[in-house]
């Protein structure tokens, strides 16, 4: 009630006007209108200059908005950026508690907490979250999503909420430029530029790769090599010995799981030997359960699985434009061999972490133009798989954004070893 009264007082004081920093569009039909919620005043300025003012509205957001999962509703409404979102969209908001309540015999789900949310008053039928492609941008996007899920959920259920996809990179070779929207896009573009004239064949005929396939093979082998070196540096284990254990099948995740049998790793378990062999010089080598349970070992095992077929199918030969140029290449030498025969033209890859790094024309071309952009529609569905950690979106928001630390710690500990790209 306090939150609703606060909104009413502010609307009365402001005369029901829209936020001053909102650059509204000319279109008055909500079905033909869209609004971008843009991270940062600088990017908001570029978006205002680059937009099509006929149907695109821009609302810049300053800094990180309030985490509504931890705040009272009166605190939420007093937060300036959230108040601007509520006012700009025109729908007001619903109480989190009210939305979750069961309806009474009159169909009223809210009692004293009657929701004032009015979907019919929505001023734009596309509400687009546009944040930077970095850690801070992801955090701000999550905070905005938390607000919409808790206090404007019908926007999500009605399919009105979207996430913009700005590019991560711009690749250029000579006068040719291309916007790249993901790590895969970048890798494929590099492969196309450098390896399009190359072909890699395995001696046994099981592998025949060109272009992006060459890039993927080299990446898997490089990851494995780095992981094996990490084992030596961090755990004092010979990477070559561990690799032979993987190849023979004697050393695997199954051997770790068999010892634990579903238990949590205990102090007594850590020293238990799960595999022993000899090094090439005849020295005994033992691998304990504690070592096999470390992130370094698990990453190496995962890298081996990715590169397993490549290790089994060598040695390799390379053709360039259909002509044999080198053969008898082992997996460890393949990367250097490919570099010798790849196209040497200069490539330039520019990383775009912030929306403000693009000028108005670039922002329009990559992220705002309906003819070329990519938008992700936000949905909220229950988990389809029985082994998913979160069974409902409600549980996910509660654990990841709420006050309780213990469930969040448990989630992090459960999935820490699966992290592939950690950006801190």
Report the location of each language-model feature.
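Conserved phosphate-chemistry cores used by DNA topoisomerases
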Residues: 1-424
């Amino acid at each position: 009630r306090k939150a609703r009264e606060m909104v009413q007082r502010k609307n009365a004081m402001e005369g029901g006007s829209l936020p001053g920093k909102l650059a509204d569009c000319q279109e008055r039909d909500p079905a033909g209108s869209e609004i971008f919620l843009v991270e940062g005043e600088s990017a908001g300025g570029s978006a205002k200059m680059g937009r099509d003012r006929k149907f695109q509205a821009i609302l810049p957001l300053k800094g990180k908005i309030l985490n509504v999962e931890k705040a009272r509703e009166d605190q939420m409404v007093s937060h300036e950026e959230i108040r601007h979102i509520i006012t700009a969209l025109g729908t007001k908001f619903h109480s989190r508690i009210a939305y979750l309540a069961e309806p009474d015999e009159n169909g009223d789900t809210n009692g004293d907490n009657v929701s004032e949310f009015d979907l019919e008053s929505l001023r734009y039928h596309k509400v687009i979250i546009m944040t930077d492609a970095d850690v801070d941008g992801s955090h701000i996007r999550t905070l905005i999503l938390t607000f919409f899920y808790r206090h404007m959920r019908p926007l999500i259920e009605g399919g009105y909420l979207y996430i913009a996809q700005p590019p991560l990179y711009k690749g250029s070779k000579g006068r040719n430029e291309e916007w790249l929207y993901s790590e895969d896009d970048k890798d494929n573009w590099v492969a196309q530029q450098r390896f399009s004239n190359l072909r890699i064949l395995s001696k046994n005929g099981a592998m025949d790769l060109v272009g992006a396939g060459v890039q993927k093979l080299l990446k898997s082998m490089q990851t494995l090599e780095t992981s094996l070196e990490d084992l030596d540096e961090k755990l004092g284990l010979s990477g070559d010995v561990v690799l032979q254990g993987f190849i023979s099948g004697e050393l695997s995740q199954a051997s770790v799981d068999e010892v634990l049998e579903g238990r949590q790793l205990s102090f007594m378990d850590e020293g238990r030997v799960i595999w022993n062999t000899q090094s090439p010089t005849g020295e005994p080598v033992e691998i304990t359960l504690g070592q096999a349970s470390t992130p370094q070992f698990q990453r190496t095992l995962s890298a081996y699985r990715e590169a397993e077929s490549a290790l089994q199918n060598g040695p390799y030969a390379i053709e360039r434009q259909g002509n044999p140029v080198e053969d008898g290449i082992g997996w460890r030498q393949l990367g250097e061999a490919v570099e010798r025969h790849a196209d040497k033209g200069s490539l330039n890859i520019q990383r775009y972490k912030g929306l403000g790094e693009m000028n108005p024309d670039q922002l329009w071309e990559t992220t705002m133009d309906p003819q070329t952009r990519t938008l992700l529609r936000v949905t909220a569905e229950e988990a389809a798989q029985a082994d998913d950690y979160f069974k409902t979106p409600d549980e996910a928001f509660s654990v990841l954004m709420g006050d309780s630390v213990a469930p969040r710690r448990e989630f992090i500990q459960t999935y820490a070893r699966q992290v592939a790209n950690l950006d801190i």
